[in-house]
Amino acid sequence: MLTEALEGQLTVVYNTVAASVQVQVEPVGRWFEAFLKRRNRNVSASFQELEEEEELSEEEEDEELQLEEYPMLKTLDPKDWKNQDHYAVLGLAHVRYKATQKQIKAAHKAMVLKHHPDKRKAAGEQIVEGDNDYFTCITKAIEILSDPVKRRAFDSVDPTFDNAVPTKAEGKENFFEVFAPVFERNARWSVKKHFPSLGTMESSFEDVDNFYSFWYNFDSWREFSYLDEEEKEKAECRDERRWIEKQNRASRAQRKKEEMNRIRTLVDTAYNADPRIKKFKEEEKARKESEKKAKVEAKKREQEEKERARQQQEEAARLLKEQQEEAARQAAQQAKKEKEAQKKAIKKERQKLRMTCKSQNYFTDNEADSVRMMEEVEKLCDRLELISLQTLNEALSAGNKEQSKAALEKQVQEVNMQLQKEKDAELQAQQAARGSEHSSAAGGQNNRGWSEEDLQLLIKAVNLFPAGTNARWEVIANYMNQHSSSGVRRTAKDVINKAKTLQKLDPHQKDEINRKAFEKFKKEHSAVPPTVDNAMPSERFDAVGADSNAAAWTTEEQKLLEQALKTYPVSTAERWERISEAVPGRSKKDCMKRYKELVEMIKAKKAAQEQVAAKNKK
């Protein structure tokens, strides 16, 4: 294809070209032979040339092959053929597993021509009859090496192969010089023909990773059937043959396991001693530290950005607040100025009103009316706004004395009417408030039933059921309904209203209620007069005896009593005497009486709570 003409160049056509003609060409001779091979084998001509080159190279190697004489050949025991070196017997000790089948056949042919019994006999050499002649070893060698399966079995246990694994200390200084030959030597067992090399110190991470991945997943063809102790062909029956096969499989599996452990040990040792692995780990560590540092720096920058944004927001909020405060301050100053101006204007208008009325003698003829009008004028000054004052002053200035007087009296009348309305509204509100308080203090329809006994019972119930009790006021109402002798049924609302009323009472009323309650208590608990009955009177724990203390129980005495009840259980001998000793100032009867009261209070409390709970369930 012609290139594009550049600037200044000229394209010239000299002649025309004839059109292409399609013709059919058939191969003949050696080209026809190559065509058939390519078609039948699906290979190219270059591949055929490579095959021919390989065949030529093998023929050249066969021609150049020099056999090595085995000095121990004539001393070999034909019966111990399994332990002989077959390659050495055929003179291929220096080639071994690399020898081709042509080389093996050529070596066998040379050995037969030289060591055949007939040849030696013709030369006058003494021959051992039968299979005891050393020539049998040559026959066994060609039998093993010419069979691919048997040869592989022998190659697997090649006596010249070095199974040693270098230690980590050996490869620490010269890693590549120590381990490279070992891996190349063991690579002969690989099923895969192509395997990665150990490489150098400059090898990339991918190459090193591929190398160790190959060896950690190493697939070996090495097998140990050549070392079978028993041959199944020698078995006399099927069962014996099966037993021999089982024993051979077990021994082969054990040796295979040991071989794979050896390979794994080799790879682990090399991996741990490989300086490249250490370098890669350090690089990876440095990379992670760098990434971590980058993340920390990024996070730090993000925090700084957030902090900067927050400060900007705070600064903006502060400026806005200052602006608002400044605007509010200015507005307040303006309002203050307006208020001051209004005050001055009102003061001026009030002064003008006073001066106008004073100059007209308050539009009256006698002293009494003058005083009254002075009060009315002051009332107008206090009640009227600026506009009303200005309007009134204009009316007083514009008209004559009679008109001014009429305008003043009209304004006074309007202000007095407004004051009267306000007083009436306030009076109605006070009456409504007093009526509400009276209704609340009365406690509804049952106000007439609150006797001194009910009041004391209410106070007792409020103390018995403190704040926090579930459905407290319903419980208190039930307690009063159970223990009141008035017969009036109380609701929770009645109890709440009465409790609030008692809280609003002044101290004198509370003292009076407490005094009446104490007098009633003293009257009910007065000592029983002596009788003429000489019999032993029964004990009453609710009456005040000669050795009893009628004073109310204090909090400290109550705590001492509760602790004594816990300390001395029911099984204690002379329990109440010991309890009374633990409570100073209280006798045995006082303690027993107090205990009885506490039991009754607890029972009543539980009964009231159960009643409320049952009512709530319904």
From Swiss-Prot:
One term of GO molecular function: Hsp70 protein binding
Pfam families hit by this protein: DnaJ (PF00226), Myb_DNA-binding (PF00249), RAC_head (PF16717), ZUO1-like_ZHD (PF21884)
CDD domains: DnaJ (cd06257), SANT (cd00167)
Gene Ontology biological-process entries: 'de novo' cotranslational protein folding; positive regulation of DNA-templated transcription; regulation of translational fidelity
Ranges for region Disordered: 281-315, 330-349, 419-448
The keyword Chaperone belongs to this UniProt entry's keyword annotation: yes
Any single GO CC term annotated in Swiss-Prot or TrEMBL for this entry: nucleus
Residues covered by the J domain: 85-158
PROSITE patterns referenced in this protein's UniProt entry, alphabetically: DNAJ_2, SANT
Biased composition (Polar residues): 428-448
Superkingdom assignment: Eukaryota
Domain SANT span(s) in chain numbering: 445-507, 548-603
UniProt-annotated location(s): Nucleus; Cytoplasm, Cytosol
Major site of localization recorded for this protein: nucleus
Keywords: Activator, Chaperone, Chromatin regulator, Cytoplasm, Nucleus, Repeat, Transcription, Transcription regulation
SUPFAM superfamilies: Chaperone J-domain, Homeodomain-like
Alphabetical list of PANTHER family matching this protein: DNAJ HOMOLOG SUBFAMILY C MEMBER 2
Function comment: Acts both as a chaperone in the cytosol and as a chromatin regulator in the nucleus. When cytosolic, acts as a molecular chaperone: component of the ribosome-associated complex (RAC), a complex involved in folding or maintaining nascent polypeptides in a folding-competent state. When nuclear, mediates the switching from polycomb-repressed genes to an active state: specifically recruited at histone H2A ubiquitinated at 'Lys-119' (H2AK119ub), and promotes the displacement of the polycomb PRC1 complex from chromatin, thereby facilitating transcription activation.
Subunit composition and interactions: Component of ribosome-associated complex (RAC).
Protein name: DnaJ homolog subfamily C member 2
Biological source species: Danio rerio
